[in-house]
Amino acid sequence: MVNTYTSYRLIAADITKSLERVSAQPEVQRETEYYLENIGNVKSIEDLVEDRRLFAYAMKAHGLSDMTYAKAFMVKAMEGGIDDEDSFVNKLTDQRYTDFVEAFNFVRNGEATTAFAKTQQGTVDKYLRQTLEEDAGDSNEGVRLALN
């Protein structure tokens, strides 16, 4: 059994190669292809949360996969946007929600929201990193935490 430090060093030594291995996994490839093919069709908050695969992909990318079931909560967070300091998401202490709303800021950007790189490739990059961390954590939780 490889210890936490050694596992972490193996992954971190060539993070690019590690991410390439993750992106080559069949399930990751399928979900990423679906996301990139369909995210451009999303024009509203409702469109995003109604497409279960797109919403789950975006949530996982931001480390929020455990909250995918809470669609009403996420709709409330997105409807308030991030520009108003009194908005719902700005009152939350977990930065992941703010990052999610920033990436999918329909309040500020309207229908153009999903045309931005941070919503397309930026979300894919985060998804790959999150998947890498989760996969590493399956065998050693310490490695997942170190990669985070």
Give residue spans per PLM region:
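General marker for long, soluble alpha-helical cores
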Residues: M1-L48, R53-N148
